[in-house]
């Protein structure tokens, strides 16, 4: 993160909103109060969204086939959906380079190499889930799916998971505004909520909804007890 912060030359002043967002994301990363130094460093990565700044580190250590990309390759690349492309085509006073944009960059420029890498299968499942999200024709749903995809792939070593709070800040949305979108994606089996992580993941065909299984078994046990209650009472 320090390397990213030093590599970016900013013309616009970093405002309090960016520092607050950096603080929130840093806290959500490990669940403890972040140091002022970490918050400041993440803020200095503006106009990268704080989540992008964090994910670039594990991403840059990933080798995609023969294609070796460093953080500096990404920052200096004029490829479609890349950082330089964003700087030339966006109002950085109002807009951040967000996680969904990073996903688009990887898909457009690196997907063939990613598919033959050690995360190729996971990437393929992620793009299939995103394709199903695109069928909804809802921009927010598509963006959420892309954020979850990259956090699933690269956030684990950072203790970073797609909680409601992370997704809310990734899209700059209020929690109430994101709730309906998450419900829609769950109903369509595009994402799944994992209680043990308190976070969402993309749904794959092999996933089992444990909460649903538990509820079904509870109902079955309750029904069996009701059915045989007379026998139980007599035996006692």
Give the label of every model feature segment.
Residues 1-82:
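Amphipathic alpha-helical segments of the small helical/lid subdomains adjacent to P-loop NTPase cores
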């Amino acid at each position: 993160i320090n390397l990213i912060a030093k590599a970016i030359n900013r013309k616009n002043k970093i405002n309090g909103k960016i520092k607050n967002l950096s603080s929130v994301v840093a806290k959500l990363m490990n669940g403890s109060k972040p140091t002022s130094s970490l918050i400041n460093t993440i803020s200095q990565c503006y106009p990268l969204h704080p989540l992008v700044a964090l994910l670039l580190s594990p991403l840059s250590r990933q080798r995609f086939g023969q294609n070796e990309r460093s953080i500096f390759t990404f920052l200096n690349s004029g490829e479609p959906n890349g950082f330089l492309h964003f700087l030339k085509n966006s109002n950085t006073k109002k807009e951040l380079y967000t996680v969904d944009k990073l996903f688009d960059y990887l898909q457009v420029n690196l997907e063939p190499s990613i598919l033959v890498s050690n995360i190729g299968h996971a990437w393929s499942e992620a793009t299939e889930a995103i394709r199903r999200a695109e069928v909804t024709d809802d921009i927010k749903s598509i963006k959420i799916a892309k954020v979850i995809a990259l956090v699933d792939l690269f956030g684990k070593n950072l203790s970073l998971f797609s909680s409601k709070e992370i997704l809310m800040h990734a899209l700059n949305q209020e929690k109430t505004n994101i709730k309906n979108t998450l419900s829609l994606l769950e109903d369509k089996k595009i994402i799944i909520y994992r209680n043990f992580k308190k976070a969402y993941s993309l749904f794959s065909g092999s996933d089992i909804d444990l909460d649903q299984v538990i509820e079904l078994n509870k109902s079955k046990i309750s029904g069996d007890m009701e059915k045989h209650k007379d026998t139980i009472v007599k035996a006692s």
